[in-house]
Amino acid sequence: MITGATLDHVAVAAERWEDAWPRYAGELGGRWISGGETSGFAAHQLRYDNGAKVEIISPHLVEHNDFLRRFIDRNGVGPHHLTFKVPDIRAAIAESEDAGYRPVNVDLDDPYWKEAFLHPKDAPGVVVQLAQSSTEWSSPAPAGIPAPVHDRTATLDRVVHAVASLDEGLALFVGLLAGAEVERSENWVELAWDKPGRLRLVEGHSDWIGPRRGRVHHLAFTCPWLDDGPVTVEPEDNLGTRLLMFPG
């Protein structure tokens, strides 16, 4: 088990940052934290009312690194990875290997951000990023990002991840990544860490998962401006990511 692991954010792939702004910044009220560009992708993060974060990533300088371009060409836009912050990346890599996972794309060169990934073929259908960083990044918001439409920001309550095997999902997210079980039903388990936002593993949804071992099903938000609900925004209407929006 990776002691001290915490769920930091969910990352969503889009062709351009700007494509995601009307929904995630305007309607849901995500507040800009930081953004930047590097070989292969550009990323920026938005924070919601409870502190939970969404990262939008888009292809950039793909001639140097085309991993995200290939992902979008193969799968379309939508959920890409879950990032877990860890206190010691080398220990986390060793724990992962001991548990039978194969860390890939290990990068320990940057003194401010060290990372490794667990491939979705090893994990239940989602890329898991392990990252060590003591820095809280911030940067000026870019021109053109919309102001929140509503007076209050939504809260990002949970990421709901459909899995073919609940036991397999728990082996990763509890056995390795130290999630604490906070709720359980017949076919799902909800996990929490010491940061905002939760992960709910749901067994089933074979029509959505298809031949995969798992797939992010939706992001659940509480939206104070809703009087009736919940409201479902289907993937085709939100850049490949389903949203469930609940009144609150």
Where are these predicted regions, by residue range?
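Core segments of cupin and vicinal oxygen chelate
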Residues: 2-5, 11-53, 91-114, 118, ...
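A short, polar/proline- and glycine-enriched secondary-structure boundary/capping micro-motif
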Residues: 65-69, 139-142, 181, 211-213
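Conserved donor-binding loop and adjoining core beta-sheet/short helix segment
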Residues: 34, 52-69, 204-207, 247-248
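Anionic group-transfer/hydrolysis microenvironments
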Residues: 11, 57, 83, 121, ...
